[in-house]
Structure formats: structure tokens, C-alpha cells
Regions:
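Conserved SAM-binding strand-loop segment of SAM-dependent methyltransferases
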Residues: 70-79
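Class I S-adenosyl-L-methionine
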Residues: 138-202
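A short acidic, Gly/Pro-enriched loop at the edge of an enzyme's catalytic core
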Residues: 80-92
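Conserved beta-strand signature within the Rossmann-like core of class I S-adenosyl-L-methionine
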Residues: 124-132
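A short glycine-rich, Lys/Arg-flanked "PGG" loop and its adjoining helix->strand segment in the class I
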Residues: 108-123
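S-adenosyl-L-methionine
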Residues: 1-27, 37-44
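Conserved SAM/SAH-binding beta-strand->alpha-helix loop
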Residues: 57
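Class I SAM-dependent methyltransferase "Motif I" SAM/SAH-binding loop
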Residues: 32-36
Length: 202
């Protein structure tokens, strides 16, 4: 499994990962983490959590992956090819403002993505998915109908999902990610949040 710290790429096997995670009960993963600012914020403000950021684009991660936090790890991997080393370890998953192939996978109910999330997770894991209007528009969906499509795909895959919640510009401005702030000050400062938990494997 490839990890990154600054500009250095490092291989981490199952045993090395187990050593890093030892002593942490709450292990969360941010999928499609972008520049890693959200992961850095959570790890710095929640020392009892272990926070993992995952993205395929290593260049964006150079800055935040440099931080010397023992409870933070960045992994280079695709959402459709999640590392098996993580199976059964994750208690909470976040997907913040996805676009491109990650958003497309959520919209189509991609089997590799949905099953991968389920296998990563411990019993009764929770998930937060935040969607923005601009990315959905680029994919050919309105915010409301795109959110409904993803909601239905998650329900069909065995997730219990609460009623979607609208995030306004103020909520986006105060959310600790670079992309949220860009959305807040952009031409379409709207987003939706889906929160739920897994009840069964798909």
C-alpha cells in the first residue's frame, strides 16, 4: 500500500499499518481527500482519533502530508481499488464534495466502490457524504435529483441514510476543507449532506 509524506512515497504493509493504528478505537477515512486539509484539521483537533486521507493524486497532498502528526496517514489509491489492508478497520467514512470518477461511482452505484466501502468498515460504521451543486451540474444532474439518486443507491446497498440536509454558504465557509470554501464563494454555493450507517453488506 502506497502512502505519502511530503514528497516521499512510502510502502506500508499490513503489519506496519497495525502498528500505526494500535491504541486507536475511532479510525476514520476521508475518501477523495483532495489536498488533505480536512484530514489534517481533524487529526490535529482530535488526538484520540486516527484519521486517514485517501486520494489518487499525490501532488495535491504534498503540503498537508508533511505535518508531523502520529494520528494521521495519507494513502495513494483509487476509490474503485481500495487497499485490502484497510478491510474491517474503518469506523467512519467521509466523502466531501466528490467529482469526476468518485462522483460518477456514487451516481451509478458502482459495485467496486460500494462493496469496497462495506468491506473497509467495522460493524455498524457511519458515513457522511457531502455533495455540491457545481460538481453535480458538470455530471449532468441537478443538486436535488443527484442527491436523490445517490441516496437511493446507498439505501439499495444496505445503508440506512437520514433525510438529506441542505448546506448553505455559511455552513460551507465554516467547513474545514479547501474545496468547501471555494464552493461557498463560487457561483453556486449550495451543497447537500447525507449521513447514515451500514446495516448489512451488499
Amino acid at each position: 500500500m502506497e502512502t505519502i509524506r511530503g514528497r516521499k512515497s512510502l510502502e506500508l504493509d499490513f503489519y506496519g499499518l497495525a502498528k500505526r493504528l494500535s491504541g486507536y478505537d475511532h479510525i476514520m477515512m476521508d475518501l477523495g481527500t483532495g489536498d488533505g486539509r480536512y484530514v489534517h484539521y481533524l487529526a490535529e483537533n482530535n488526538p484520540g482519533w486516527f484519521v486517514i486521507g485517501m486520494d489518487l493524486c499525490r501532488e495535491n497532498l504534498h503540503e498537508h502530508s508533511r505535518a508531523k502528526l502520529q494520528n494521521m496517514l495519507f494513502i495513494i489509491a483509487s476509490a474503485q481499488e481500495l487497499p485490502r489492508e484497510l478491510n474491517g478497520l474503518i469506523s467512519h467514512v467521509t466523502i466531501n464534495f466528490p467529482w469526476g470518477s468518485l462522483l460518477e461511482g456514487l451516481l451509478t452505484g458502482d459495485t467496486k466502490l460500494i462493496r469496497g466501502l462495506a468491506y473497509l468498515s467495522r460493524s455498524a460504521p457511519s458515513v457522511d457524504v457531502r455533495l455540491n451543486g457545481g460538481a453535480l451540474a458538470e455530471a449532468g444532474w441537478a443538486l436535488e435529483t443527484g442527491t436523490e439518486q445517490i441516496y437511493n443507491n446507498m439505501i439499495g446497498a444496505g445503508w440506512h441514510v437520514n433525510t438529506p440536509v441542505m448546506l448553505n454558504a455559511h455552513a460551507l465557509r465554516t467547513f474545514p476543507s479547501t474545496w468547501a470554501k471555494r464552493i461557498a464563494f463560487g457561483c453556486d454555493p449550495r451543497a447537500m449532506e447525507l449521513s447514515g450507517w451500514l446495516s448489512s453488506l451488499p
